[in-house]
Amino acid sequence: VDLQFKGPFIWLQRLVEVMSLQQQGCIIQISSATAKIMLDNHAAYMGTKAGIDHVIRTVANEFGEKGIRANTISPGLTDTPMTADALQSPALANAFAQCYPLGRYGTSDDIAAAALFLASEDCFMTGENLQVNGGLNLRRNPRAHELEEAMIKAGEIPAPE
């Protein structure tokens, strides 16, 4: 909770102080599709991301008149160092990819492109949560037992006795 909510909250407080003096700014916070979509065994993570989404909306509302825009980006599963272990399992990678209408999970380039748009002068958005997750929010994440079954079927882990 300290890393996922308290740290960003304190950072946002300081950032808004500086941007208020400058009468401009653009805040882009990374959230997660799990703020809205369930993922087994991730309650604290999901809750902190939902909390950050709400804090960003509050910042956008309270500081918009000072020229500050604030938005979040919500990736789904994205090929990054944080997910590297999970994606090494072909069964897990495939189980997650099947949940995405676009047929794949995201890349850091997908997230960077969204951030560039949000940071651009052409962006007339504030207080928004940009879902950059290949349509995952139209479906759902696989359940823990479904992931386990996929790994057993692929021979990656033994079946329980």
Task: Describe the role of every protein-language-model region.
Residues 12, 48:
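Active-site helix of classical SDR
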Residues 37-43, 65-66, 103:
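Active-site loop immediately N-terminal to the catalytic Tyr-X3-Lys motif
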Residues 37, 116, 126-161:
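Short C-terminal tail/terminal secondary-structure segment
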Residues 53, 63-78, 125-132:
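Conserved Rossmann-fold SDR core element
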Residues 32:
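Residue(s) in the substrate-gating loop at a strand-loop-helix junction
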Residues 69, 104-132, 137:
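C-terminal substrate-recognition "lid" of short-chain dehydrogenase/reductases
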Residues 17, 61-62:
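Alpha-helical segment proximal to the catalytic Tyr-Lys
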